[in-house]
Amino acid sequence: FGAKYPPDIREGGQWWRLVTAGFLHGGLIHILMNSWSFLTLGALAEEAFGASRMLVIYFCSTVFGFYLSYLGSPALSIGASAAIFGLIGAMIAISIKEPLRYGHMKRTFIGWAMFGVVYLFLNLRIDNYAHFGGLVAGFATAYLAGTPRAEGSFTERLWQFSSWACIVITAASFLKMYLWFSHSTQ
């Protein structure tokens, strides 16, 4: 439907799947686990980075995670885990970049990442490429983003614009998915 599926991305030009795959889930347990993780990490990330930066981190982690998965795995893949790992990477980055304010969290988030890596290799049905890509993208985006500046500054307006661009791209991706699906079922 909108999963990451390399043949459709490569031959069909369906690049929107790199976005939509991050919002689809394979069952109740899958969505509950990712929702719990997002509620926990999302609140911490929003507090640290602000809503605009967090949204950009989430989006970049999703897209880069599924892009790395597209390059490395032929399997069908869905789920918000690439973005969840991106938020873990973001919290590691901020704990390194601002140790006085967030350094006390570093061990916790490195522990989460290590637990995730160990679990990933024990469960062969999990998309390791997407998770690793999300972790790297979240770390890199957060390291570049830093924490919020003065309200109304050029930097803050740029992050707000970027977050709106991510929302528009996500909406356009779902529109493309809908149009593809409605056309392919006729």
Each model region followed by its residue ranges:
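A detector for small-residue-rich transmembrane helices and their helix-helix packing motifs
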Residues: F1-Q186
